[in-house]
Each structure stands twice: as structure tokens, then as C-alpha cells.
Amino acid sequence: MRLSIPARSLSFLALLVLSFPVAAQTETQLPVLQGLAPVTALDKTEAGKAALAANLAVTGAIQNGTSAQPTLLPFPEQQQQALHDAWITGENAYGLADGLGSALGAAYQAATGYTIVEEDGKKKVHAGQISPVVAQLIAYANSTSRADSALTKFFFANGTIDGKAPVSAAALAILTEIGGTPDMFGRAYGRPAGSEGANKYGNSRPFQTLPHFLAYEGADFFGRASGNVAYLRGPSQNLIDSSSYPSGHTTYGYMESLLLALLVPQRYPQMVVRAAEYGSNRITMGAHYAMDVLGGRTLATYDLAQLLANKPGYVGVKHGKFEIADFRQALTDARADVTKALEDKCGKPIAACAADDKSRFADQARNDAFHQSTQTYGLPVVFAATAGKPADVAKLAPEAGYLLTAAFPWLTLDQANAILTATQGPGGGFLDNGSAFGVYSRLDLYRAAQQAIAADPAKQKK
């Protein structure tokens, strides 16, 4: 799908996507702030300083196309995919559905296409939906992670709620306890908040700090002639004063990709790869550092696990027009609608359609290599105590198992957490300080999903 939308309409839509009110932090957000806070103290240790230096170097190499990191596409094509991914299809996960494969991706996108409609004499974009049930599930999950992402950006940029209003004493204590200071990236990379060429709030982005930034042009999501600079400095999107950490696009990309994985479990591993690609594409654009992407991934995965566990403060909360009391049941209801819609469009059982794939996600060896490279982006160990020690997921974050059981019902929660423990990535990263939140930075849902699928009793009988 390609749409041609007037620049005025596009700017308005970008405003809708990027601007939302930031409220005072809630009780559920304090653990999120605490979990992401280790970045603020990286300059206090030699290991942390080395990680900061590597973060800039890795980011620059990926953005410039000089990295040895495997990608799903040749670099020029990956750049174009990154430009396409700059637009958030938050209403229906349309832009991420290509991870479902050739057949199912086309079927999903045919059911959720975008159209331009006239309302009150103005052109507006209408996002198609599988069903109201699916739309509600997506909106509720996105609202949860979006609120967390918005708060964390300002908190880690200048220690405020919205750029100006101070945070609570409890939130401030999070930084005090670890000797943390906001604007870590701005200060570390020579662009402290408010200085020439810097973000006015803090945590300037790579396009503001990299010694060499690669600008490129192409067609965006709407098929319009554009380029990465247009989505960094305007007019399509202006991120000059939008703080870097954590990546909001990555948070969205993982949340919606994982929702699609849960809705279509046959494509769970590939949807995790799609999420990883979406996050890595933010580095290619010059919008984010590797640490931003890792932070966004961890935030989305953590939030989704809390939703699936029906944790108080996550469910039964009003998000706009929607309120969900039982997220797992809402997911089950939505899956029934998605399955019917996809089978109707594809013309075959969903398992057969899932296997019909000629997309960039069809090569498992390529998926393996690329996804593995994004687990840590090669950043060095910061927390030596957790580096060589597997984290006990069941003990630290037992709700994480729902990320598997919600898709693969033959698993018990204990079995799911055992798989997550066995497949977790390397430890000791900049978020892996031994906390419950930190363990989410180690989860390897790609390998975990593969093991879960292999454990299907129906497969074992064949």
C-alpha cells in the first residue's frame, strides 16, 4: 500500500502520533523508571564509560553502513525499509504485518489498508481494522507502552515529567540511589542539553552527535519523495528536541510485533525478527543509539508481560475510549477474529498460509544471524556480577512466561519460564543489574518461541 498525502495532512498526522499528554508517574511506572535508570550512572565506572563509547561507535557504524552486523536486506535496501518504517501504523499494526510472511502479510494488510477520506472538507487518513475487538487490543497495549515511553524520555533527559514539571520524590530517589544524572548521552557525546546543535531537554540523538552522519533519500511509507533528514529535522517529523532514550519507535515496534506474534503464533519467531529489524532501522535512520533500541525493546517486552499477567494498574485502567479487565481473554477473542479474517483472505487454513513465505523473513539462517546480532549489538559488559550467570526468570520475573503461554497453550507457566531461562541472551549488559526489569533485557523470544513450537505435542506425535 502506498498513499500520496498532502504535506499539510502528513504534518498533522505526525503530530497526532508523536504528541500525547504526559501525566505524573504512576505506581506501575516507578519500576519502569528504575529499570531503565542504570544508563544514568554509566559515567561512574570504567565499564560504563567503555559501554558509552561502544554505543556511539556501534551506532555510527550501523548508520553509516560500515558495520559487520548482518542485515535482512542489502544496506541500500535496508535504508529504504528504515525510511518506510519511520511512519508508525499504530492503529492497526499494518506496517509490521509483513513479518507474517508473503501470504499472511498480504492478507493482513488487505484487511487493514489505509484510505484517504473527506471529513468536514478535510482529507484524513482512515486506518482499516480487522475488527473492533482487535482494534481495542492494539489501542490498549499501545497506550500502556506509549505513556511509559513518553515519561521515561523526559525523566532521563532532564529529570522532569514533561520537560518542565518536576518528578515525584520517589522518582527522584531512583537517580539519587545510584548516583545517576540525566542527559547521559548529551553529556557523553559533546552535546549537553541546550548547547549549540543539541536537544534543548537532553539526550541528543545520533544525527546530532555522530562525527559522521549519512543522509539519504528515498520513498517513505506514503510513497512520497523523502529522506531520513526529513524524518529527523522536518518537515515530515522533527526530532531535534525529542530526547533519545529510550526509543519510542522501538517500543511501539516491539509491542505491536509481539501482539501479532501472539495473534498468529505460527509466525511468532519471524515477528520477533521483524521487531528487531524495526528497532535496528531506527539506528540506520540516525534517530537512535543501540542503547535506545535495547531500552525500547526491554520496555515493550516488560509492559506486555505485565498486561498478559493482568497485573493491577495495567488492566482495568481507562485508556482513551477503552478499558480491558482481562488482557489474556481479550487476546484470545482478538485471535479468533484475526484467524477468521486471514483465512478468509488467504483461502487456506492459517497454518498453510503461514508456511507460504517468500519474503525477507523466509531464510532462517539469515533470521538467526540478524537477530543474534541485535541481542546486545556487541556492547560490552557493564555489570560483571550478572555476566556469566544465567538469570532465573521464574524467580525474578515469573510473569514473563505469559509471553509464551499466551501463544502456546501446551506450555505451563513453569515450562515457559524454564524455556526463557534456557534461551536467554548474554548477561551483564547496561540494564542487566540483577533486577526483575533487567532480566527482560536478556530474553531471547526468537529462540524461546522456536523451542515452544518444537514442544507442541501435535508435532511430536508426527
Where are these regions (language model features)?
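Bacterial N-terminal signal peptides that target proteins for export
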Residues: 1-11
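N-terminal signal peptide c-region/cleavage motif recognized by signal peptidases
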Residues: 19-21
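Extended amphipathic alpha-helical segments with heptad-repeat/coiled-coil character used for oligomerization
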Residues: 244, 287-350
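Extended ligand-binding clefts on enzyme/binding-domain cores
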Residues: 343-362, 366-371
